[in-house]
Amino acid sequence: MIDKYLDRVVQQLDEKVGRLQEAVGGGAAKDFSEYQKMCGEVQGLLTARLYITDLRKALENSDE
């Protein structure tokens, strides 16, 4: 049951990362500081995604 919620969160993270990557690649950052902020946001979202993936694996292993 929790899998569908975790899947939805991962999907939302992936969508946000994709939008940020497109923005960075498209030159949306006005200056280097904004570029760094956007890259940091991508890094943070990917870290959160990794934590969720690890949590899912731990939950699957606890069921066994």
Label for each model-derived stretch:
Residues 29-60:
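Short, charge-rich amphipathic interface segments used for partner binding and complex assembly
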Residues 1-27:
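N-terminal acidic leader/helix
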Residues 1, 57-64:
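Short intrinsically disordered terminal tails
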